[in-house]
Curated annotation (Swiss-Prot):
Its EC number is 3.2.1.114. Gene3D superfamilies: Glycoside hydrolase 38, N terminal domain (3.20.110.10), Glycoside hydrolase family 38, central domain (1.20.1270.50), Golgi alpha-mannosidase II (2.60.40.1180), Golgi alpha-mannosidase II, domain 4 (2.70.98.30). Residues 72-1173 are lumenal. Catalyzes the first committed step in the biosynthesis of complex N-glycans. It controls conversion of high mannose to complex N-glycans; the final hydrolytic step in the N-glycan maturation pathway. Converts GlcNAcMan(5)GlcNAc(2) (Man5Gn) into GlcNAcMan(3)GlcNAc(2) (MGn) by sequential removal of two alpha1,6- and alpha1,3-linked mannose residues from the alpha1,6-mannose branch of the substrate. To a lesser extent, also able to cleave beta1,2-xylosylated Man5Gn-glycopeptide (Man5GnX-GP) and pyridylaminated substrates Man5Gn-PA and Man5GnX-PA, but not active toward Man5-glycopeptide. This is Alpha-mannosidase 2. It comes from Arabidopsis thaliana (Mouse-ear cress). Glycans are attached at residues 106, 262, 467, 675, 772, 782, 991, 1098, 1108. SMART domains: Alpha-mann_mid. Its cofactor is Zn(2+). Residues 1-21 are annotated as: Disordered. It is found in: Golgi apparatus membrane. Residues 1-50 are cytoplasmic.
Amino acid sequence: MPFSSYIGNSRRSSTGGGTGGWGQSLLPTALSKSKLAINRKPRKRTLVVNFIFANFFVIALTVSLLFFLLTLFHFGVPGPISSRFLTSRSNRIVKPRKNINRRPLNDSNSGAVVDITTKDLYDRIEFLDTDGGPWKQGWRVTYKDDEWEKEKLKIFVVPHSHNDPGWKLTVEEYYQRQSRHILDTIVETLSKDSRRKFIWEEMSYLERWWRDASPNKQEALTKLVKDGQLEIVGGGWVMNDEANSHYFAIIEQIAEGNMWLNDTIGVIPKNSWAIDPFGYSSTMAYLLRRMGFENMLIQRTHYELKKDLAQHKNLEYIWRQSWDAMETTDIFVHMMPFYSYDIPHTCGPEPAICCQFDFARMRGFKYELCPWGKHPVETTLENVQERALKLLDQYRKKSTLYRTNTLLIPLGDDFRYISIDEAEAQFRNYQMLFDHINSNPSLNAEAKFGTLEDYFRTVREEADRVNYSRPGEVGSGQVVGFPSLSGDFFTYADRQQDYWSGYYVSRPFFKAVDRVLEHTLRGAEIMMSFLLGYCHRIQCEKFPTSFTYKLTAARRNLALFQHHDGVTGTAKDYVVQDYGTRMHTSLQDLQIFMSKAIEVLLGIRHEKEKSDQSPSFFEAEQMRSKYDARPVHKPIAAREGNSHTVILFNPSEQTREEVVTVVVNRAEISVLDSNWTCVPSQISPEVQHDDTKLFTGRHRLYWKASIPALGLRTYFIANGNVECEKATPSKLKYASEFDPFPCPPPYSCSKLDNDVTEIRNEHQTLVFDVKNGSLRKIVHRNGSETVVGEEIGMYSSPESGAYLFKPDGEAQPIVQPDGHVVTSEGLLVQEVFSYPKTKWEKSPLSQKTRLYTGGNTLQDQVVEIEYHVELLGNDFDDRELIVRYKTDVDNKKVFYSDLNGFQMSRRETYDKIPLQGNYYPMPSLAFIQGSNGQRFSVHSRQSLGVASLKEGWLEIMLDRRLVRDDGRGLGQGVMDNRAMTVVFHLLAESNISQADPASNTNPRNPSLLSHLIGAHLNYPINTFIAKKPQDISVRVPQYGSFAPLAKPLPCDLHIVNFKVPRPSKYSQQLEEDKPRFALILNRRAWDSAYCHKGRQVNCTSMANEPVNFSDMFKDLAASKVKPTSLNLLQEDMEILGYDDQELPRDSSQPREGRVSISPMEIRAYKLELRPHK
């Protein structure tokens, strides 16, 4: 998205520049080969280095002779050496890794050793926003005239065009109006001159263009890529958001784009380009590293952090995961130094001058003129010297912010290079300027067009030759000469006190749909894998074949929404509708597929007809009528003498013992399992968000189900002559202004007479304030208490917008006494429903708080809260709704929030930055922890924003309704709110050891119990019900169950995905003898101080021993197991940075199929599955 230019006057400061040690040109041509220093180089002490160099030849000769004699003695004459690691990057130089001492795997105190942490930066920086002059957020940059005498400045100008897949237009509108013309222009203009270069990022547009392009255009683009003129950077389906996106979806969107690119053009990206996400997550750095990426470029980080890093020449660094004590996750990063990625803010520190070199702003083009008053002019023989020197001055000033004498200059903006004339204006003028600079040796500079690969390769080569390391710097063995850094870059501020924390919550309805599509897609992928694994080819290969294009469409619709104006909620209203419609269509398609797949997996349907064209016997129990409608439970009409079949699918790796629910129209019903054995059950009245009619007249039916890991289980809902007790009705109590209270039959109702009420199970008791329905505290089984202090509040925010959160003061409580409170106590579920009274006629929120009493289930450990939110109507304009838990945990205003559902990040509330700057993304989990080890966690199944503004507080924003645009290009507010439900799981835990959150700055992990609770919330059981009832007297068919795993996986091992990557090429791969399945695993790191609870809940094993693929599946034989990258394209583990001790043994060894995974790691494997003979 474009930015208006940021103009200002300010004061001066400066830094010196570095010099190198060689002068001749080392700028690579398009035909240059990569010299890639991927692995670690041992760091030596100076004396040792000097000794080695002085005696190098003697040492080398002696070592070589000894090695030769040892080899000859042990093995005889060696044969040819072959490598099992085959890769397209044959020119890579792999260097041996240094030895690093391992630390305890689940020690919460272990962490990375680095030079810089983002916490250190926040502690040090004063956030004064001082005026820096022409570079408003920096200082007046100067340099010495002789800085480049020993080594010339090498300048790479990188043309690019940022193409948002949806923002102010839909993705298809952008393609038709702009992106297809841009790609046509790139192909034509680059083909004219081999000196011209370009980079492209978004595969969603390239794939769309490819479908329309003629064979000649396709061939021309492929040639440009192969010749190095056009580089595909990132290569994901989109340039994803990094705050709200879950790591599952990030992996999916990058893999979808990378695999299409590799299949179509035959290249695999290795440089990431992320100029527009609004803040950066360290999870992204990890995922890219494990996909084989070597370098990253980022732009939108806090302007004060940029300034500090620039002052210390640390804008290029090695990003290391905070938990990585062994330095296996290192990736090289280039951070752009200025306000924006447009041309005025990329050539140097003075935008008024840089804008004069954006030749698309010359009169006659459609772009706005430079706002500083001086405009670009055509370069001629008469003005080339003056223009070149002015441009080179900016290049030199920018280069002083970095350590090396290799300089990157992006040249582009949103949807640029749309016409031949525009592209020619840029290429023509810049080439003339380059020619002048390059033909004058006295300037000590060489400039040319380049790609990211050209730049990063040259930087690495220079760093190999010139020692830029500083005394005492930890750095990295991967690329020497640069500092190491850990942490993330949230929350982003681009100027003054404008913090981009609003988009963590904008359009929360669609953030929730995003997660539903994720877990539904994952479930469908798992079912597809078992279908193709178990089925004989002739019998049922036809079944999934015609669905494969819908599966691909679902992957791509999920990927599209990960765009940094999609899941962020920062697009125009009708563009949001387009995203929502695409996701809704895919949800429907996936549910239909799953409903048919269960028939095959349970052996219900085996007709020879093409079964994917015939109607299914089942349908999803929850359905959405349209893209912006809440899911509605389809009620089961259990008439006398009938039974309804219910099929439950468990997407978890462990057996699920869980209380499940469906909605029924009648109360006189019973539940039976697949053997027609009676199952105890409970009914409760269904309540709704309506203070004039609290009860719908329908009932929630609960029973405890047991479903095998990744499996299916059948239950029956019966009404009639069965030898089972009817579902037990819950008992209701109320505090309400209704007189008389509308007690629904067949329930008994009594009045709440006290100021407090309680619900309880064997683990905890919840205490509520009857006057306002809020949760006061949790009383634990041992008598200890956790104060919760639940409070609903609102910010008044007239300056907030889709991106920015700018509140006018603190949030004020909105709940008043004397609302409706109804408690429901039953056999399996205890619930408190609260419809609070507020100053508005219709409350914007109601809630249900539940405890489960299933017995030995994960649910028993949590407090489940459903917030029904309706921030609808003008009464709520410029309001932002929050829930605040005012606990008694002495957290010192330190809290932890997750990054992309993958890892936790330590957060600290700073008084020196405004309230909005202390809000952070919460994709799925936040917790606070006290000095006595008491921990209070909130799990969410959608991304939101979280803060801890005062001692013991944990505050989460639920929704926001904003009238005004916040000046970041969208041109509107956020007024399209939808009714929605936000679900939290609260968990209060006691530690067996004490830890001060303020003094301990290392990363914290969730407990094992917390991990499992989060997984159950985000990967719920999928429920399907029969479309037609059956006669209760006919007890057939007995569908039974489907249990594909030989045994549940270890509790700390999570299946991220189990899929057939190329379902449309499934048969072809069989003929090519390639593994057709992919299994992605994550081993969870957990806080061992809390292990005692987690092991009590159906947790029989941990992944301390290697995982054995050969005995993982019950009736399937796994073979051809090969480790691969997370984008499923690389098979060289050294490229991916994995620790040597994790690498699998050669396939010729008897331990084939056994793999070890370290905590925190995500590993991907290709494998083949066939039924046992």
